[in-house]
């Protein structure tokens, strides 16, 4: 019975996925994922990326966000990306495959950043979802806390943080934590984000000294 339920749920998800207009547009444009459109909408409203910036991209695969940011920061910019999954190369992106929760992977990532600070840290990380919020939300909050920890390590004063968060237990506390570290914090729900999804994007700018 459980397998039948999962099969029906998976079929509905696939049907919804391939009928999604942003998935179809991404395929037509040769984009890596529909996440490209989410970031484009955020950039139009919040202007996070500028030529010459250095950006850290956490949870980067398959590369939709990195693919977009390359067009915004230009040839003098740099993206340092990390994901547990493999990602096909993108010109201008220094990709590290590994589990961000692993100390050795984190160390390697920090070494790639080097001594200079970055202007933007962005995270589209998400755990493997079970469909049970009581299980999924704590896993998600753990990942976004790690992303915020990366900000503390590498983000320059005045820098920006963009993070995908699933609303649920711990969300309000996390938001307060971010507000203590940044001068301006907004919550975005891009059109390309499915309406029934709990995901929202926190856009934090002006990292405090």
From Swiss-Prot:
* Catalytic site positions: 164 (proton acceptor)
Q: Name one GO cellular component term.
A: cytoplasm
Q: What is its main location?
A: cytoplasm
What highest taxon heads this organism's lineage?
Answer: Bacteria
The record's annotation in Pfam families points to:
FtsJ
Q: What InterPro entries does the entry give?
A: RNA_methyltr_RlmE (IPR050082), RNA_MeTrfase_FtsJ_dom (IPR002877), rRNA-MeTfrase_E (IPR015507), rRNA_MeTrfase_gammaproteobac (IPR004512), SAM-dependent_MTases_sf (IPR029063)
Entry binding sites for S-adenosyl-L-methionine? 63, 65, 83, 99, 124
Listed under catalytic activity are: uridine(2552) in 23S rRNA + S-adenosyl-L-methionine = 2'-O-methyluridine(2552) in 23S rRNA + S-adenosyl-L-homocysteine + H(+)
Query: If you read the UniProt record, what top EC class would you report for this enzyme, in one word?
Result: transferase
**EC identifiers of the protein:** 2.1.1.166
Report the locations given in the UniProt record.
Cytoplasm
Q: Which GO terms describe its molecular function?
A: rRNA (uridine-2'-O-)-methyltransferase activity
* Keywords noted in UniProt: Cytoplasm, Methyltransferase, rRNA processing, S-adenosyl-L-methionine, Transferase
User: What role does it play?
Assistant: Specifically methylates the uridine in position 2552 of 23S rRNA at the 2'-O position of the ribose in the fully assembled 50S ribosomal subunit.
Question: What is the similarity comment for this entry?
Answer: Belongs to the class I-like SAM-binding methyltransferase superfamily. RNA methyltransferase RlmE family.
This chain's protein is named: Ribosomal RNA large subunit methyltransferase E
Please name the source species: Pectobacterium carotovorum subsp. carotovorum (strain PC1)
Which gene is annotated as encoding this protein in its UniProt record? Answer: rlmE
